[in-house]
């Protein structure tokens, strides 16, 4: 008889829940709920389990916020809870609450070739560290290492490191944004809101007044090639994505590969392929040769957060991935 666990991927707006076959890791019966419709995450879980008439003893839910202890307070939502109390209330034997990019990193060993698009470099080296990052509402970062037949995710808040310009144009953008917002992190330029910041800074650098555009507007105008400022912002976004990925590669020696997740890049995939992304990745001066062979992959799996939550839980329960 198949034994299932509950897995989830929760962001600021939606909660996506599914079942994971503990033996195989297969994800099934995924359903998305609006977080605005429920008073708590526990309430959503109860609705899901009732709707699917399933009894589970174990669960793992990825959440887009730092996880530093038993108390979890979501960054972009009003939900807050005790992991221990939620586990007790649901009657679970195991309940893991992990960072969303911990889940994405744990999905990597489970991905197949059809779930990846490669951007330069050679073949990944088995046993070497892996980096994963992705731009969406924010900029998520994690690393992954393989030790004693176990995958260990190293989460953090790498998206909030300083934005490090490496050209006159990037330095000008830093100056403009710093005057507006103070500290300029990488996330301030590598995210949906970050794309807007790039566009606004480019226009303001020419002493013009920027329009009030959304990330979607900037992307659409750039792809239609009817707004030079939007196209420049998107081009610069791709280059800076490359620079940041190269920084991650240098920091951990990620010869196991660098992986890109998140919802932004797939929206302009062909543009990204033709951009200066890989050039930015390898633009490391004396260490260009060091990163030249490191492969970069775009994850195109539909639900890496659910897949990785399942992988994390299965490993916790003693399965070898």
From Swiss-Prot:
Protein encoded by which gene: glk
The name this protein goes by in its record: Glucokinase
UniProt similarity note: Belongs to the bacterial glucokinase family.
GO biological process: glycolytic process
Keyword Hydrolase: no
Alphabetized GO MF terms: ATP binding; D-glucose binding; glucokinase activity
Catalysed reactions listed for this entry: D-glucose + ATP = D-glucose 6-phosphate + ADP + H(+)
Main subcellular localisation: cytoplasm
Residues binding ATP: 8-13
Regions annotated as coiled coil: none
NCBIfam families: glk (TIGR00749), PRK00292.1-1 (NF001414), PRK00292.1-3 (NF001416), PRK12408.1 (NF009073)
Native species: Salmonella heidelberg (strain SL476)
